[in-house]
Amino acid sequence: MENNLAPINEDPFPIKIGIIGDADLDTTISLQDRMEYAVCTPFGKPSDIIIEGLIDGVKCALLCRNGRLHDIMPTNINYRANIWAMRKLGCTHILVTHSLSSLREDIMPGDFVVPNDLIDHTTRRAQTFYDGALGSPFGVCHLPMYPAFCERTRQHLLNAAQELDLATHSKATVLTLEGPRYSTLAENNIYRKWGADLLSMTLSPEATLAKEAGILYASIGLVTNIECWCANQPIATTHEIIYVFKNKVEKLQQVLSKAIANISKEDWSEDILKAKILVCSNFANRNK
């Protein structure tokens, strides 16, 4: 008789999955035993309260990146507090969603993307926990950013989207803008030459900080519009972009739920340990 049983998670590091996304996820993700917490961190307050609960029996923590009223612009998001709060609550993984703008003809509005690399083009955001400020961790961490995401976690998001038969791109490079404005035609042509496939305003430094915190991090993005790189291309309005996102947000929730269920069945002890060792092994401390 063929054994179709999935491996059971028996690892000594019980998993807990953080979810960071846009305001609409707060109303579409169903959490059992829902509890709300105001978490304090050395870096200030997170974007909003954190909602803890169970998704199919898996411990999860949900945070709205821009606030539940979507009233925090990308530059002013306290990325360090958001990630530190997830770490403080014991999250081993963070799954995130992003709205993305396409720089490629074959990546269309309504498509889903599971990026495998990033370009940080922001200029005004705190990039590290280890900045020497009062209350921050001691030392300087020179963290390698290849790969930019946890590949195993990334594959779970990709598999979940494909199992739901969603139009999904398995690899892409996302460039993060400072925002809140969109980029010019000239800027978009530069970004395309750099190898960027999509634009975000919130992926960086979130991904870097999650890695610095020793958390397994991966993203799934929804393409909401095509950016202009030719003079005759139409330009989407913010209302049109929001409309595309709202029409697909339930699909994002389904991807997350399926990925969470599959992640919870596996042993992650080695991956969790490696993520923590990576951080510890990349300090520059001359007093050792």
Curated annotation (Swiss-Prot):
The compartments listed are: Cytoplasm; Nucleus
HAMAP family linked to this entry: MTAP
Q: What's the protein here called? A: Purine nucleoside phosphorylase
Under the heading PANTHER family, the entry gives:
S-METHYL-5'-THIOADENOSINE PHOSPHORYLASE
Give an example GO cellular component term for this record. cytosol
User: Which family does the UniProt entry place this protein in?
Assistant: Belongs to the PNP/MTAP phosphorylase family. MTAP subfamily.
- In which organism is this protein found? Drosophila pseudoobscura pseudoobscura (Fruit fly)
Recorded hits in CDD domains, A to Z, give: MTAP_SsMTAPII_like_MTIP
Site note Important for substrate specificity applies to 183, 238
Q: What is its EC number?
A: 2.4.2.1
Q: Extract one GO BP annotation from the record.
A: purine ribonucleoside salvage
Question: What Pfam families does the record point to?
Answer: PNP_UDP_1
Q: What else is known?
A: Although this enzyme belongs to the family of MTA phosphorylases based on sequence homology, it lacks several conserved amino acids in the substrate binding pocket that confer specificity towards MTA.
The pathway it acts in is: Purine metabolism; purine nucleoside salvage
Residues that, per the record, bind phosphate: 65-66, 202
> Gene3D superfamilies in the record, alphabetically?
Nucleoside phosphorylase domain
Q: Does the keyword Nucleus apply?
A: yes
Q: Describe the reaction catalysed, as an equation.
A: a purine D-ribonucleoside + phosphate = a purine nucleobase + alpha-D-ribose 1-phosphate
Q: What is the enzyme's class at the highest EC level?
A: transferase
